[in-house]
Amino acid sequence: MKALLKIEWIKTWRSWPVFIMGIGMPVGFFLLFSSIVSTPNPEAQKDFLLSYMLTMTGFSMSSFGLFTFPYMLQEDQTEHWLTYIEHSKVSIAAYYLSKIFRVLLNFMVAIIVTFCVGAFFRDVEMPFFRWVGSGALLLLSGLLFLAFGLLIAQIKSQQFMSLVANIIYLVLPIVSGSWVPISMFPKWVQSISEWTPVYHVNELVVNFAKDGKFSWKSLLFILAYTVVATGLALFIKSQRESDRG
């Protein structure tokens, strides 16, 4: 396991441009739009900056779950690294845990960097326990992005996989209210938004950060989406392996 983690650490440094882009682009959007949008009510402005910082943190994390995770899994398949692992003394569970640990590390860096930018450059304020709690809830919500990434990794064609990942990455945050409040959408779009997984990630984290309230409904939605996506990915993988055998 230690050797696998070392390999993942080396691979992370080799792909540093992707790592920087995954964090830098959402942070750039946060700084840009937070400087443009201004409300006459100071409290409303504070709420906007807080919620926008949190949604952009989730947006940053989604890039690692939807792109980095499935691409590293597919790369290991095409380069036969996974085949080597399966025929070695290393357990397949240790292999997947090392991959998950790498993405979780990316998640944590994205959370820390975006939170620091919000605090030092936009004067976002929260009690300490809410900073920690919001980060923990975002990290927990990262399981959703990992599950979707695992499902995307089952797509054989790299071009189609990239297309699907980009659609989910760009469309879901827009529909879910990460960019603009869903109250600005038509009613029929709002009804769709409230069923999307990213909407419930935003609800879970933002409600806790603002009021210290825990949304069990949103947590259940996130867990349900995570279980369904993971189950579907494992089913497709097992079917493919049985057909091959």
Question: Predicted segment positions?
Answer:
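Aromatic- and glycine-rich beta-strand/loop motifs that create alpha-glucan
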Residues: 1-25, 80, 242-244
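Short helix-capping/hinge motifs at transmembrane helix termini and TM-loop junctions
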Residues: 33-41, 118-126, 153-157, 180-185, ...
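Transmembrane helix boundary and interhelical loop/hinge segments in multi-pass membrane proteins
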Residues: 66-88
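Long, hydrophobic alpha-helical segments
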Residues: 32-33, 51-71
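Transmembrane helix segments
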Residues: 32-37, 155-195
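Short hydrophobic, aromatic-rich alpha-helical segments embedded in or entering the lipid bilayer
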Residues: 2-4, 180-219
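Alpha-helical transmembrane segments and their short interhelical loops
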Residues: 92, 100-163, 215-219, 223, ...
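Alpha-helical transmembrane segments of multi-pass membrane transporters/translocases
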Residues: 33-34, 203-245
